[in-house]
Amino acid sequence: MATAISVGVAVPAASRRREDGAGPPLLLRRRCLVEGQVRCRLPWLRPIRHNVRVQTSNVNVGAGSYEGGEAGSHGEHLDSSATRDSNKPTKPPSGSRYPQSIAAVLLLCALASAFIVFFKGQPSAVVAMLAKSGFTAAFTLIFVSEIGDKTFFIAALLAMQYQRALVLLGSMAALSLMTIVSVIIGRIFQSVPAQFQTTLPIGEYAAIALLAFFGFKSIKDAWQLPDNANGNLQGNSESGELAEAEELVKEKVAKKLTSPLEVLWKSFSLVFFAEWGDRSMLATIALGAAQSPFGVASGAIAGHLVATFLAIVGGAFLANYLSEKLVGLIGGVLFLLFAVATFFGVF
């Protein structure tokens, strides 16, 4: 805070000649007027005004007495501190890192729980438990189904424009909710009323039928792709999942999203509605009807997490080297294998 103080300094003229021009110069005599306080002035003075700016600091100084050099050094210290503080550039507060912190905490919790479960029992027992629970089947099917899927490219396109952690959180929230809903629908097949119950495992047969249907359909669609579809996913964007994802993102995200909540909501809504009725959802329903709901839900969510993470980190890179035809054939074969395994009770 700077305070301007005007100080008037009167500089007298050295001499004044007589009017007739003769004789030595007359000395000026001061006349003092007393009006409450003494105010002296000299006649025929020319006032010269100067503005003196005094720099003050808004530092609170406690009461105390200073003598001699202590007072001077204290004043110099305050002046130098104020100067240094005023010369330092002010930095705006950094943005919050809550989404990254939440993702890191969830990842650490998952790793800690996996570590405890794995080392508490024998590794072979853990693997057998995962296989029997449906975790392995759900993870493999969902992971292969999501690679090159519409939701895969939606997450990749959004991650190119916005913060990756926010896109991952929004996408995984949608996929986790969709997985839970699918498992609940699958368990409804097991809750048949008593008057309709028979000795036939209707839920398992429905799951086998769904898995076989998607297996044959995936192989048929991949086989009908043109020969130039062997190149990569991005090269076939005119008629593939990438073209649909690009059109959907351009239509729904017309303006730039600035708020983190907007990015979370847009990622959630786009992925949720794109996943509704998709083959991965129906595959989760089929597995949920035939196997353990907890194993299927955890395996499906883990498969979604790995596939979505790959899409966000290197979706554009993977699209250059993955063949749409090859991905479709592998997915169809896996669907058929799990249908056969479910029929013979392997899982």
From Swiss-Prot:
Swiss-Prot/TrEMBL keywords: Chloroplast, Membrane, Plastid, Transit peptide, Transmembrane, Transmembrane helix
Primary location class: plastid
Renumbered residue ranges of the record's region Disordered: 70-97
UniProt GO cellular component terms: chloroplast; chloroplast membrane; Golgi apparatus
Transit peptide start-stop: 1-12
Molecular function terms, GO-annotated: calcium ion transmembrane transporter activity; manganese ion transmembrane transporter activity
GO biological process entries: calcium ion transmembrane transport; calcium-mediated signaling; Golgi calcium ion homeostasis; Golgi calcium ion transport; manganese ion transmembrane transport
Membrane topology, from the record: Multi-pass membrane protein
Domain of life: Eukaryota
InterPro entries given in the database record: GDT1-like, GDT1-like_CS
Similarity comment: family membership: Belongs to the GDT1 family.
Name the record gives this protein: GDT1-like protein 2, chloroplastic
Taxonomic placement: Eukaryota, Viridiplantae, Streptophyta, Embryophyta, Tracheophyta
